[in-house]
Amino acid sequence: MESLFKRPFMVYGLAAGLRTVLLFYGAWQDAHSAVKYTDIDYMVFTDASRYVSQGDSPYARDTYRYTPLLAWMLLPTTWAIPGFFSFGKALFALSDVVAGWLVAKSLTLTHGMSAERALKYASFWLLNPMVANISTRGSSEGLLGVLVVALLWAVLNRRIYLGGVLLGIGVHFKIYPFIYGMSILWWLDEKEFTTNKAQSESREVKPKFKDTPVGIFISQILSFITPCRIRLTLISLLTFVALNAAMYLHYGTPFLQHTYLHHLTRIDHRHNFSPYSTLLYLTAASSAGAVGHDAGGPSGSFESLAFIPQLLISVVVIPLVLGKKDLPGTMLAQTFAFVTFNKVCTSQYFLWYLIFLPFYLPTSSLLRNPRLGIAVAALWILGQALWLQQGYLLEFLGISSFLPGLFLASLGFFAVNAWILGVIVADVGGLNLESGNEKRRVK
């Protein structure tokens, strides 16, 4: 096994081969089984592409809640060429492999690892059957993996302009990467202090005033406003606004409604691991039963209020506590918290944080303490298995298992994830700045 990682072409070949096998198996299962391998989201993507190919809006397809860019990218699925319907799956699978390659390169260039060791950790993504399964079923998360790892690499290498563009594209493509903005801005402080100390000193308030509470506060504000932070903020905002303006001019209000505003009041209780799922189910049921009546009330604001604890933890608390310790670890903790506390949590969302595992594992307690690592993996898988068992009763046997089965399973999985989040935060918080900076040093 050790010799495997000395041959990168073998690792990448295995990663590509695994996905190729799954693509062919998926085509066979779709043709011979009532239970389809292809994810329903892929059908939504390709239907939207078909509408675009006919000169219509992708939002003519019900439940298409994504940027038009995705429908444009999958236009080859509409071509009358045998096998091209799976073009999108192949693209997503290839993106998986590219994301893994970027992870390995980042570990080598910014973390000072040997190519062999970096590839070993990158294989937690490249050779992960769950990652391969999700992409070959037609989930587009691999594209986000490429964008997020490229963003991380750009920031760690001080490519501020590139980082700003990638952040803007990522947020346009799938909203959630906006959470990384805070941690990146906070992390840049350490670098800015060491490289632009003279500039910081030139912005200090007058000596007689700086020791007062107001003076200290003003000094802290001024020291936070640095050229790097300004450039990153402006470029990411300009990129995001430019993409949205172009899409709005082309598709109008439906673009804003379906791509962004829909998520504020989204009610999605199917295939949802979140403990909110049962409440969403009850909300959906009450809304359906309120035909001809006022459907307002507490349930009407529930979907929006669910964002408060999620955003407070992932956007404010974690970046401020961990941001200066280790950027990849902070981004992992942010993403894990965002997914755990999200009102909608599906298997695809797990890929959002799994992409950071290769950066986290080298210094994590999960490897230093194998028992802890095994317990984390076992409970995480068991939590999903219990939920899926209840979901099977509901989806395939027609047994109403929302209460108490699915609700208790969701609470159990949430508790497991909250515990794992605590482990991650403790690990990243335990790093000292010197070791973190040394680990990120470019050779």
UniProtKB/Swiss-Prot annotation:
Entry annotated with the keyword Transmembrane helix: yes
Listed transmembrane segments: 8-28, 68-88, 90-110, 136-156, 160-180, 232-252, 273-291, 302-322, 347-367, 374-394, 406-426
Cell compartments where the protein resides: Endoplasmic reticulum membrane
A Gene Ontology term for the protein's cellular component: glycosylphosphatidylinositol-mannosyltransferase I complex
Enzyme class name: transferase
Membrane topology: Multi-pass membrane protein
EC number, as in UniProt: 2.4.1.-
Pfam families in the cross-refs: Mannosyl_trans
Principal subcellular localization: endoplasmic reticulum
Keywords, alphabetical: Cell wall biogenesis/degradation, Endoplasmic reticulum, Glycosyltransferase, GPI-anchor biosynthesis, Membrane, Transferase, Transmembrane, Transmembrane helix
Record pathway: Glycolipid biosynthesis; glycosylphosphatidylinositol-anchor biosynthesis
GO molecular function, one term: glycolipid mannosyltransferase activity
Domain of life where this protein originates: Eukaryota
Alphabetical GO biological process terms: cell wall organization; GPI anchor biosynthetic process
Function: Mannosyltransferase involved in glycosylphosphatidylinositol-anchor biosynthesis. Transfers the first alpha-1,4-mannose to GlcN-acyl-PI during GPI precursor assembly. Required for cell wall integrity.
Similarity field: Belongs to the PIGM family.
PANTHER family in alphabetical order: GPI MANNOSYLTRANSFERASE 1, PIG-M MANNOSYLTRANSFERASE
Record protein name field: GPI mannosyltransferase 1
Native organism: Emericella nidulans (strain FGSC A4 / ATCC 38163 / CBS 112.46 / NRRL 194 / M139)
Gene (UniProt): gpi14
